[in-house]
Amino acid sequence: MKVGVLKDIKVGEYRVIATPAEVSMLVGDGNEVYVQKGAGEGSGFPDEAYVKEGAKLVDTKEEIYATCDFVAKVKEFEPCEYKLLRENQIVFTCIHPAAHPEEVQALLDSKCIAFTAEDSHRYGSPNCEAAGKAGALFGLESLLSINGGMQEYRAAMFFVPT
């Protein structure tokens, strides 16, 4: 199967759907993996790391969509991507269907096979555990005196002027 790893284009999104180690496993299983140039940079994975694991680098998202049977990315599709989806192409990404009806309609119109990343793990799994721990750490960080400390916290929580 031809698997495509897209560079996310949503503003503020720096994650990548597959690490070089995961690409290595896909290639080892006999898949051809295409990675869009720069897909892993925001997560600390240079293009060379993907090539070392057997991926083929491509310049554009259009090449990924046109070439690959399976396309994956982290965040929901942007409107500029809707026209690139193909019938029977398998896509895996966050979709959040209730919040993005126009995206759902584009997926239906394209006749692709879509899987939602946000619903692909069991709630309470390590993924959620990690998110919970990170949330607690960010909360603690906000209470540090260099970030305003407890006074800022009280003001935010109880609307008490400082």
How would you describe each model-predicted region?
Residues 2-106:
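An N-terminal-biased, well-structured beta-alpha scaffold segment characteristic
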